[in-house]
Amino acid sequence: MKSQWECVLENLGEWVGSFTTVTSQGEPIEDIPSVIKLAGISDNQAVHLVLNRFYPLPNSTEKYVKEVVWDFSTPPGVSVIYFETGAFSSGAPVVYIGVKTIAEFSLIAGDRRFRMIQTFDLAQQLDRVTFVREQLQGATTPERPQVDIADFVGTWTGIATTSYADQRPSIETNTRSTFSVSDTGYQLVEQDHSIDLTVIPDLPSPRLWQFTDDRDCQSYQILLLPDGGYAITPAKISLEHPFYLEIGWIYQTGQRQRLVRRYDSSGKWESVRFIVESIEQIGRAHV
């Protein structure tokens, strides 16, 4: 098993992409091109990071650059856990009313990365989602289209690795979930637990779904995004019940990765789960 630092090093390289921010309803706010370079130094005992983001100038076709430079020799991030592919999640160790909650996620597949920052306001209502689509400099892998209902339909099986905030040993478990669509609605069956989903009406495209998970009595939404990505969050975090924050990425047809960050009913961070799945059986979507 790799150390946390060895997992960090899976992210070395020059990644070209953009930071795209949308509202909680998926409406666009901004799209900022970016280049981030992570280079190993001192025989990979440390990493030199340079992030450049290219912002438009008012009334001009020119752009100005905001640069961040950072050297680090321990895994960066707050309450962060890395996994063997280089995937990671970081965020607040405790969620409070009156303090913004920010959670970051990153998934990696070959020469591509899909990252996300979920931001909740002072009342713990989802404020915005920033997703970052990147590929290594020189890579030619095409970006995937926005997730569609048909991409989920079928039975997914895989392996989940769960790492804990209290540093107890990680565990691996098998996963199995089935997503089905009919003329009457959408249903997810996961480990023998059934969830019904509803599309939010009056949006330009069916990119936002809602469901209630009776295991933790929270109402969640699923926001569908470009490049095969999606976010699952409470529309508003209720600190009376446990909750989770999730990112998913269908990085190629029938293949996906997920990160699930869990909190208990007091708002304390408990664990991060990294799931790698493939589709076993494809169903039929009625759209």
What do these predicted ranges mean?
Residues Q4-V8, F19-R284:
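Soluble ligand-binding/transfer domains with enclosed cavities or grooves
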